[in-house]
Amino acid sequence: MTMLLDGGPQFPGLGVGSFGAPRHHEMPNREPAGMGLNPFGDSTHAAAAAAAAAAFKLSPAAAHDLSSGQSSAFTPQGSGYANALGHHHHHHHHHHHTSQVPSYGGAASAAFNSTREFLFRQRSSGLSEAASGGGQHGLFAGSASSLHAPAGIPEPPSYLLFPGLHEQGAGHPSPTGHVDNNQVHLGLRGELFGRADPYRPVASPRTDPYAAGAQFPNYSPMNMNMGVNVAAHHGPGAFFRYMRQPIKQELSCKWIDEAQLSRPKKSCDRTFSTMHELVTHVTMEHVGGPEQNNHVCYWEECPREGKSFKAKYKLVNHIRVHTGEKPFPCPFPGCGKIFARSENLKIHKRTHTGEKPFKCEFEGCDRRFANSSDRKKHMHVHTSDKPYICKVCDKSYTHPSSLRKHMKVHESQGSDSSPAASSGYESSTPPAIASANSKDTTKTPSAVQTSTSHNPGLPPNFNEWYV
């Protein structure tokens, strides 16, 4: 990490005196001052810092001295800190094993060849505090406070880059700074300030994606101002303003009170935010209690048109058609189906269990069914009853599904003059006969019927009488 300090007598406690006149060196690895060397875009201070800068870099082994309590004013962050935060600029780290700065040129080259992370900027306002001594955590306290916002904006303690270092130095505050909100602010003229955060952190329902830093107990992940786990100090941010908010569902009661004298009669039109509130309202205020004898649905545009039910529970089940209430979900995982009546749920669960309790009562038939209605439809096969009659051609069928298939033939005839062209509909005519009709259109209908009855290779059309 690069730390550019103002060369001058303002750091006597750090053991650094004044430097000589600045020398101009060729620095090919550095961008111009206006290209991001100074995060504040101040070319004057950037030029001064670039001209009279000093870099301090110790042995990489000193990166681990912080945990053992050894005092060090400047600790290299190239080995421990960069590896903890996932930096891969290994080609920039040149290990200069020196305990002091031998010359300005060597220090400047070491500074400009290392990673650019921290820039010390001369504060124009100036602070009255002077650096009288160098504590172990004095510099890192100033570095850690670099992510706080400018004056007048509250700064959460979660912005600390090195919370472990502050915990270690809590009992030994730096004599060169002051403590504010558990943060030790360095009282130097070159105290580091980060770029002001223009975005407020927002709440996130997910866990911390930077949990990889847990393996480094003394370091916390960088970019803590990205809005993860710091939302406890701020309200919802600007990011959620652009997220699509869920549309508030309003359920309206369309029950018409028959006691109204006005014409036309108006519906209730009370709105509710949940289905439970709507159902409770209809049951308590419109359907009535056990004393109610008239079980009639007065919902707007109800197709029953005032026809009464024999029992109250039947009226309640019917009202679910209007309200859309389905209080009986399938308990089997992954199914997700819901039903308005418990009887339908009971029948549906047999599709999961494979239970078929209804056996065909005809002797010699082993067919079983999941519900009694399917068994009743099947019984027409044995009795030769055909209660399902076509209203167009008076044909009758033993099963309603056969009648539905037959009705598609009439639908195809309405769209196409040829019955063979089914237009995607399934007809009751066998495919072989349909293909014969399409190939030979000169045959009369009687000839087709004769060929059908005398063709031993064609099976009978079982779809007409059995499903």
From Swiss-Prot:
Residues 86-98 have a biased composition (Basic residues). Acts as a transcriptional activator. Required in the earliest stages in both axial midline development and left-right (LR) asymmetry specification. Binds to the minimal GLI-consensus sequence 5'-GGGTGGTC-3'. This is Zinc finger protein ZIC 3. SUPFAM superfamilies: beta-beta-alpha zinc fingers. It is found in: Nucleus; Cytoplasm. Changing G17C: In HTX1 and CHTD1; uncertain significance; no effect on its transcriptional activator activity or subcellular localization. Keywords: Activator, Cytoplasm, Developmental protein, Differentiation, Disease variant, DNA-binding, Heterotaxy, Isopeptide bond, Metal-binding, Neurogenesis, Nucleus, Repeat, Transcription, Transcription regulation, Ubl conjugation, Zinc, Zinc-finger. One of its GO terms (molecular function) is sequence-specific double-stranded DNA binding. Residues 67-80, 435-455 have a biased composition (Polar residues). A motif (Nuclear localization signal) lies at residues 297-322, 330-352. Changing K346A: Increases its cytoplasmic localization. Does not interact with KPNA1 and KPNA6 and increases strongly its cytoplasmic localization. GO terms for biological process: atrial cardiac muscle tissue development; axial mesoderm development; central nervous system development; central nervous system segmentation; cranial skeletal system development; determination of digestive tract left/right asymmetry; determination of left/right asymmetry in nervous system; determination of left/right symmetry. Changing K356A: Does not increase its cytoplasmic localization. The gene is ZIC3. Transmembrane segments: none annotated.
